[in-house]
Amino acid sequence: MTLVLGIDSSTQSTKALLVDAADGTVVASRSAPHPPGTEVDPRTWLAAYDDATEGLLERAEAIAVGGQQHGLVALGDDGEPVRDALLWNDTRSADAARTLVDEMGGPDACAAAVGSVLVASFTASKLRWVRDHEPETAARVRQVLLPHDYVSRHASAPGTAPFTDRGDASGTGYFATAAGEWRPDLAAAALGHDVALPRVAPAGSVAAHSAAGRVVAPGTGDNMGAALGLGLLPGDVLVSIGTSGVASAVTATPVADGTGSVTGFADAQDGFLPLVATVNAARILAHQARWLGVDLDTLSDLALASVPGAHGVTLLPYYGGE
């Protein structure tokens, strides 16, 4: 039996699944929580990884990490974080996003360059926020990683150069999604100086090895991982309700929507993942269930029993900004 270890480093926790590679049977699983909030010390993810993989790692022949998208992990000369990570759902960078879009020539030009119109969640927007509000910190940044990159580095042998994949990279705002390559000029424009970016490992490649010699795969972002894991095919639509709400599909051609309604990501293979999202999802359902005094299953039943438009009731679900 060949066992592989899948890691989900999400907003709220690290989950580890030990799986039989032949048929997908889950052999064992563990999890460990992450700190709350939208600004956290990324080193806590490494501690959660160590906790969640205890007793599983030594049984696996290969490892892959999926992670929350967009988060800014800014490293200094020593390879350590210069500040806490700003997560995807930290919306303080909304003004910075609008500024960057203007500097790129407007929404259409921005979407043509990187596949998406930048919003607060994108990594580039967070870089500009740090530049504007913490210039001394910005000056210390030498390399920028995403959460999944940072955890993958930890899973690899000491000294391994950081790596990412095209799917997660497409959510930064400085990756040309259609061409499949970094735009280091856009990262420098956001931060104010040149910065090192991780190697983009090809899909299906051996990105690295662990200290014990286990294969470490490129991994990907959480939305790309979900589409891959569910075997999404052209014509399928995936709807996911978690901390965020997402509807996505896979296509063979890139998307560049200048209205900003559709985000034009790459997927975890050689295709693309057009996606619409909200940062307000499960919290809205949980709040409405509490307000009505019912559980989530009953809330779903009530929604199905209603009519489109809910008899004219309108809810603006922007509890955490957007």
Regions found by a protein language model. Give the residues of each.
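Short beta-strand-loop/turn "lid" adjacent to the catalytic site in phosphate-handling enzymes
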Residues: L57-N89, A113-T123, H148, S152-A176, ...
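Active-site core segments that coordinate phosphate-bearing ligands/cofactors
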Residues: L5-G6, A94, V101-V114, F122, ...
